[in-house]
Amino acid sequence: MDYEALKEQWGEVEDRDGVRLSWNVFPSTRMEASRLVVPIGALYTPLKEKPDTPLLQFDPVSCKQPCRSVLNPYCQVDVRARLWICPFCLSRNPLPPHYKDITANAIPPELHPSNTTIEYRLSRPAPAPPIFLYVVDTCQEEDSLAALKESLIMSLSLLPEHALVGLITYGTMAQVHEIGYTECPKSYVFRGNKEYAAKQVQEMLGLVQPAMRPGMPMQQPGRPFPAGPASRFLLPVSQAEFQLTKAIEQLQKDPWPVAGNLRALRCTGVALSVAVGLLETSFQNAGGRIMLFAGGPATEGPGMVVGPELREPIRSHHDIDRDNIKYYKKALKFYDNLAKRTAHNGHTIDIFAGCLDQVGLLEMKGLCNSTGGHMILTDSFTSSMFKQSFVRIFEKDADDNLLMGFNAVLEVLTTKELKVTGLIGHAVSLNKKSTSVGETECGIGNTCTWKMCGIDPSSSYGIYFEIANQGGPSQNMQSPQKGMMQFLTYYQHSSGHFHLRVTTIARNLSGPAGDPAIAQSFDQEAAAVLMSRIAVFKAEVDDGPDVLRWVDRMLIRLCARFADYRKDDPSSFRLEKNFTLYPQFMFHLRRSQFLQVFNNSPDETAFYRHVLNHEDVSNSLIMIQPTLDSYTFDQEGGVPVLLDSTSIQPTHILLLDTFFHILIFHGETIAEWRKAGYQDQEGYENFAALLEQPKEDARDLITDRFPLPRFIVCDQGGSQARFLLSKLNPSTTHTSGAGAYGGVGAQSAQTIFTDDVSLQTFMEHLMKLAVSGTN
């Protein structure tokens, strides 16, 4: 099967099951697996929107304990004996009585070969409606606060009627608004410079009640939620909308005076720990989101990231490298503990930063990364980037249910040939051991079950596996054996019930050693994304240069293993079609903002890495290797061009998409004509149309992008052109003279002033090292 046909097949599997695998044939021995270099991994998007996924209105048929795998198309069914055989533990299970009428031609939907992904609406209802708790920073300029208030009031109309909603505001103090009290505005005030234990918060808010003691039966689910003490602070939208709108409208800038040489006092840490304490008491394991809107860094109390004096700058990457960090370790520990508590309770924390300065995302990143929350970094709450990204969180499906899932848990089962080594993505381990758990660890390992809390249709997780068998495949098998994995995602649907999405994947095991089927089954795009997740995971704990060396070493080893070459002859080096782009992806990953922190603040690095760990293969590839399209007079529409400095031409317009930025770049001549106003003159309609075309294409790119990218229009030689130049392969630098691609293009291409090596030089070194056999 040729590469294009295989790619199409993998695309169909991704559309159907939300899964891309690095290897689509599994090696049959551990020895063979170790020679693959790139681990066996799956990038899985559990809630991938798929209109034709059947929603079954009954509980699934499961295998007996401890296996608990779910009936799926790969199960053998004995219709006469009314039995099914589990492919994971090989035990025989009786079919339930209501399946008595099945025949070889009339099978239930979960056994249908095309239903490898299926969703069940479980009979278990959610313990409470979804909860939304807004935590709002009032130390902001008037215009920013006014824009934020407008967005918050508008968002109330996007929430389901029965959802519970509450408000905490903070500045020098933190205030919990009692929206259930209608006589006058009433709030409980917490000191901003004091650390409150969970118990203190609960006592001060009067939340301690006997009904919610551990071990007591939970109240029967249903509407409306019973009026416990927490209902003074969290009320259904239908009841609280008027009170809450009034409370938000009346929000004023924090009254605490701020001297000219000081930052405003902000107790972000106290506000968050009060929010966590409020939900923890009454709503443990009920789906809820704490949404933090931060207009600046925490400057007092637990979790402070910078002192109040303006002459003391907030930490940079350089400070962290030199260990010149006064507050970092303490703040990180505080927020990480808060993240653990929140994840344990099944709640999600979103952070919206609306500030030109850093707000402390580096310290707070665990709050989002452990709970599946969103992280959105903008310059101000007045920006369309914030407003539109915020609205997109509340997108709904055809039945008017929010597209977000709450309180989610992912379990992975494997057949005996495979073991799961870990997960990289926004989740925490539930420390559940099973026969599916491997000996080694990659990412969050030593478990087969993870808790994600917040999950949405684009949440994607990198799951890594190892091969368990020491010996080879059994020689007497007629048909190839299959290795299998099953993903079980339990989550609270916003309609009020728990759902279970089941995806079952089976792939052939390779034949005897040296089976060419393994190399042909390599999906270079999925592999690049799975490897970049490992690199970013390593970058969080290791030194930058060490991670780059690891990326290089793995690439050299992969090429040495799978390329065709004569030893010590770089000119003979050839890669198969499904490997040719992989070195290029690694070249751009090495230069990307995920691994190179130069020119980015620590907050930006935390934000970029957070988004990479949330997206699927195609979006992650855009982040690693941005797309570049060129527009000029003698062609129809945009044409994809090389991400290379030779693509900059005076009479061309370029459209760059890095996922985080969408940039329109006018070549020198085009910019001069535009400044001269030719597009407004008669007879130059084609020039006006040329200027419009990239804008229209950019609009299409923005429509379903989350978070909303920053939109930049710039000219060759302008200061904003740096966004493009930093992403291009520098094949024409001040040292290289004419371009490496040669020809006319290179003569008129822009020179890039950089000491970075070009892709061509990188490939030359790679070939030399791969064929030398010393790796």
Swiss-Prot record:
Lineage: Eukaryota, Fungi, Dikarya, Ascomycota, Pezizomycotina
Family: Belongs to the SEC23/SEC24 family. SEC23 subfamily.
The protein, known as: Protein transport protein sec23
Highest taxon in the source lineage: Eukaryota
Residues reported to bind Zn(2+): 63, 67, 86, 89
Membrane topology of this protein: Peripheral membrane protein
GO BP: any one term: intracellular protein transport
Function: Component of the coat protein complex II (COPII) which promotes the formation of transport vesicles from the endoplasmic reticulum (ER). The coat has two main functions, the physical deformation of the endoplasmic reticulum membrane into vesicles and the selection of cargo molecules.
Name of the gene this protein is made from: sec23-1
Assembly information from the UniProt record: The COPII coat is composed of at least 5 proteins: the sec23/24 complex, the sec13/31 complex, and the protein vtr-7/sar1.
Keyword terms: Cytoplasm, Cytoplasmic vesicle, Endoplasmic reticulum, ER-Golgi transport, Golgi apparatus, Membrane, Metal-binding, Protein transport, Transport, Zinc
Family annotation (Gene3D superfamilies): beta-sandwich domain of Sec23/24 (2.60.40.1670), Sec23/Sec24 helical domain (1.20.120.730), Severin (3.40.20.10), von Willebrand factor, type A domain (3.40.50.410), Zn-finger domain of Sec23/24 (2.30.30.380)
